Each structure stands twice: as structure tokens, then as C-alpha cells.
């Protein structure tokens, strides 16, 4: 079951070339879907005992390439608008927003080995 409970729904808008990253939630599970435009969505796992520690995953999402992305707590994530127009992302989270529940890093922070200017294949 994808949705275990309801906390809130919110929308995030971004424009061509703009990166919104990095952040991870301590408690919140995210359920992202792109409703307008094209997004490169990136996940990074730095959990100490995770079998996927150090892995990066890129997803290219749009209404034409629909993917519901579920991000569990403690996974770094972010996105970049890769289309030519505004993109809008919807998130159906399982807990309401709390400011002290989220960690943030700059998109170019070297703690995450990712370059937003390239695509991993």
C-alpha cells in the first residue's frame, strides 16, 4: 500500500534550469508526482546501515512519463526543471509539515556526489 496515512498535500513550482535540493525528512514519507512540465528527480541514500548506502537514483518525470515517487524518511532528494516551461510537483505526505523535521543542504554540497549539470545513465 503506497499511502499509509494522510498528513498534507502541497505543490512546488520551479522554472527551467532551477534546482530545488537537497533535503531529507526525519519522519515524513513523500509521494511526489509531476503534474506539469518535466523534472529530473534525484535520490541519494546516506543511511549508515542501508544496503543502498551511497547509491544515487535519477528519475525523469512528466505527465507523459508518469511515475509516483515514494521517498521514505532519511533519503536525500531534490529535483531540477529540465523542460522549457514551468514545472509543478505535487506531494502527498503522510505527516503535516514541521520545520524542525527537515534537513537541508545546498545543491552543490560535496557531501552528496552529484552534479546537477549531467545525467547519469
Go through the PLM ranges and name each one.
Residues 1-68, 82-121:
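Non-catalytic, conserved peripheral segments adjacent to functional cores
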Amino acid at each position: 500500500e503506497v499511502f499509509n496515512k494522510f498528513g498534507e498535500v502541497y505543490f512546488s513550482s520551479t522554472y527551467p534550469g532551477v534546482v530545488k535540493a537537497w533535503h531529507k525528512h526525519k519522519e515524513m514519507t513523500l509521494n511526489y508526482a509531476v503534474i506539469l512540465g518535466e523534472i529530473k528527480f534525484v535520490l541519494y541514500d546516506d543511511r549508515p546501515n542501508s544496503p543502498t548506502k551511497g547509491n544515487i537514483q535519477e528519475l525523469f518525470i512528466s505527465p507523459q512519463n508518469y511515475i509516483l515517487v515514494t521517498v521514505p524518511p532519511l533519503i536525500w532528494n531534490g529535483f531540477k526543471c529540465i523542460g522549457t516551461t514551468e514545472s509543478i510537483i505535487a506531494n502527498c505526505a503522510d505527516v503535516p509539515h514541521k520545520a524542525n523535521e527537515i534537513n537541508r543542504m545546498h545543491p552543490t554540497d560535496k557531501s552528496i556526489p552529484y552534479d546537477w549539470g549531467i545525467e547519469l545513465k
